[in-house]
């Protein structure tokens, strides 16, 4: 029989754990999300970052009430070689979620035949399809909507589509849930789709939840991982407001998960580095020309201090369903 930890490692889900938490900070992101009618405001984490008493953990526990393992529940980590399982990182993240009463989102399994097997093992689990480039109305999102409709018509246990793009922490018994599709939502500043609500409706109109599962907004940066200029910084703020507002405007969007929350822990600088694109030489020497890399995508800076992106997410949550799609400035 599979252990509960094994189930969490192989099933894509939201788990509600049994813990009574301390009184909430009424300006924290999770409190404001709950007050706005959302189930959670979450983030991705990696187990080595869970150092007791660290700035990272203090922010995690004070601002977020849902956790997604960034890598620890992926197949190649859980079962690095066939038949050999390692739940070390998974167990550490599960323990953190239990300690704080946070929701735990399993990330991820393969689909679609696994939906039925997962449902048989854990019938209370909500199961989601999580994909990228479906945050706008395009050929892929429309095709995914047809896939979802086909699965539902066949009786598949599909509950949500994730786009990878109550005012207190929970205190009830263990509840493992899904029925949705995930919108990943990895955006580039200034290029965030304006039709996210319409894309969400492709799935929510079928009764599927539409969580925003991996939100970040990368922008061009200088050598210090700071915004390259004021224009891109402003675009990034607008894009965070637009994204969070899209979730707030859809009753079947249960919440938003930021893909990590502090720039030093983001995956983006390691992938979208600046590159040498030209070399021009004269008798006096050579000029190297680099393209700008991307980074500064999250809510906290390298010193774990909140940035303008944090405050705009906070403001969008305060504005709630009346936020609209355009940010008009932070209300002090």
Curated annotation (Swiss-Prot):
Gene3D superfamilies: Glycosidases. Residues 26-316 form the GH10 domain. The lineage of its organism: Eukaryota, Fungi, Dikarya, Basidiomycota, Agaricomycotina. It is an enzyme of class 3 (hydrolase). Its main location: secreted. It comes from Naganishia albida. This is Endo-1,4-beta-xylanase. Pfam families: Glyco_hydro_10. One of its GO terms (molecular function) is endo-1,4-beta-xylanase activity. GO terms for biological process: xylan catabolic process.
């Amino acid at each position: 029989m599979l252990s509960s930890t094994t189930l969490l490692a192989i099933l894509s889900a939201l788990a509600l754990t049994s813990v009574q938490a301390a009184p909430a900070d009424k300006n924290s992101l999770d409190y404001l999300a709950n007050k706005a009618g959302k189930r959670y405001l979450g983030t991705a984490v990696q187990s080595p970052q869970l150092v007791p008493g660290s700035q990272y953990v203090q922010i995690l526990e004070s601002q977020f009430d849902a956790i997604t393992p960034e890598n620890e529940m992926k197949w190649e980590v859980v079962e690095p070689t066939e038949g050999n399982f390692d739940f070390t990182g998974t167990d550490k993240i599960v323990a953190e979620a239990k300690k704080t009463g946070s929701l735990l989102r399993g990330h991820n399994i393969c689909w679609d035949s696994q939906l039925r097997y997962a449902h048989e093992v854990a019938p209370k689990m909500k199961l989601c399809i999580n994909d990228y480039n479906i945050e706008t109305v395009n050929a892929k999102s429309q095709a995914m909507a047809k896939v979802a409709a086909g699965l539902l018509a066949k009786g598949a246990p599909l509950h949500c589509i994730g786009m990878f793009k109550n005012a207190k922490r929970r205190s009830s018994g263990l509840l493992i849930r899904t029925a949705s599709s995930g919108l990943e939502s990895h955006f580039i500043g200034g290029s965030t789709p304006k039709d996210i609500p319409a894309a969400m409706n492709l799935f929510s109109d079928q009764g599927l939840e539409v969580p925003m599962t991996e939100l970040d907004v990368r922008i061009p940066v200088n050598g210090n991982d700071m915004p390259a200029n004021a224009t891109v910084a402003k675009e990034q703020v607008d894009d965070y407001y637009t994204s969070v507002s899209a979730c707030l405007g859809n009753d079947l969007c249960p919440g938003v998960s930021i893909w990590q929350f502090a720039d030093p822990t983001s995956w983006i600088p390691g992938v979208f580095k600046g590159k040498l694109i030209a070399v021009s030489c004269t008798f006096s020497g050579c000029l190297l020309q680099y393209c700008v890399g991307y980074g500064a995508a999250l809510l906290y800076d390298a010193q774990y201090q909140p940035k303008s992106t944090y405050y705009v997410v906070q403001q969008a949550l305060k504005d709630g369903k009346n936020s609209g799609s355009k940010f008009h400035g932070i209300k002090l």
